[in-house]
Amino acid sequence: MKKPIVAVIAGGYSGEHSVSLKSAAGILSWLGSEPFSTFLVLIERDRWSVRVSEQREVPLDKNDFSFDLDGERIRFDYAYITIHGTPGENGLLQGYLDMIGIPYNTGDTLVESLTFNKYVCNRFLSGFGIRIADSMRLTGRDTQPDVADLIARMGLPLFVKPNVGGSSIATTKVVEAAQLLPAIEQAFSEGEEVMIERLICGTEVTCGAFLRKKEVVALPVTEVVAHNEFFDFDAKYNGAVEEITPARISDEATRLIQTMTARIYELLNARGIIRVDYIIEADGIPTLLEVNTTPGMTPTSFIPQQVRAAGMDMKEVLCTIIRDGLNETQ
């Protein structure tokens, strides 16, 4: 029987391009050559290509998601999206794949566009009783807000960050009024909307989840102890953080985080692997920070740590997701 041909899609148009390539390398190493034939698909603004060997790339035909290899026309059976940012995390790529009938590992266009907008996603989930931080959104019309009015409403300290995007790029902790406008300008440099969020104090944790045989599996919880003021890009990717899996929290708190994560997965009708970040405040109740539907997948990322702590391996988890996706289309 012919092996299914799987595209591991990486790259994208955002500042997280390099992170995406590292995640793709991790996924390809775990999948290996069995039970699927896997290829790296690189998406750039001016070119979509397939890496068929270390030294060779060939163009990808966007009409049917296929490519020519030595005279043979090869069409992908499945797409594993590991783009962090646009177009893989905001629903654009999902819409394209839906139109040409290629199954994939994430939520659909609606789910991805919702979760990519931090402010809107958190507001949506708060309607189901999920606690969120006090926040506000600025659009392109609000590039010079009244600082005094904003601080009177939100207080200090607070966080300023792009409303879409990830990896804590252009995120600033603001502790005094003079820092606010520069922080807003920096966040606007990465996108058209800015989210301002009240500082939450407590223990930062994160929990992954995936679907196995139509049941949501919540993974062990990781505690995040940043050596910087907060878990910024440097902490995430340059080692300025301590990541403890399982987290040093009570069994009751662990169960609560896992239950909330599974519920968020179901409320969003998510697919594949997601990761949800929280702060456990002094009252023991978790406050939602954000939902990530294409989490980092390098060997040292949170999800692989949690999978190992659960006694599973990444190949097993990835193959489960891909097989389930292929079976749904048969």
From Swiss-Prot:
Name listed for the protein in its UniProt record: D-alanine--D-alanine ligase
Biological process annotations from GO: cell wall organization; peptidoglycan biosynthetic process; regulation of cell shape
Membrane-spanning residues: none
Major subcellular location class: cytoplasm
Binding-site residues for Mg(2+) 2, renumbered to this chain: E290, N292
Chain residues that bind Mg(2+) 1: D277, E290
Catalytic activity reported: 2 D-alanine + ATP = D-alanyl-D-alanine + ADP + phosphate + H(+)
The protein's role, per its UniProt record: Cell wall formation.
Record lineage: Bacteria, Pseudomonadati, Bacteroidota, Bacteroidia, Bacteroidales
Enzyme class per UniProt: ligase
UniProt KW keywords: ATP-binding, Cell shape, Cell wall biogenesis/degradation, Cytoplasm, Ligase, Magnesium, Manganese, Metal-binding, Nucleotide-binding, Peptidoglycan synthesis
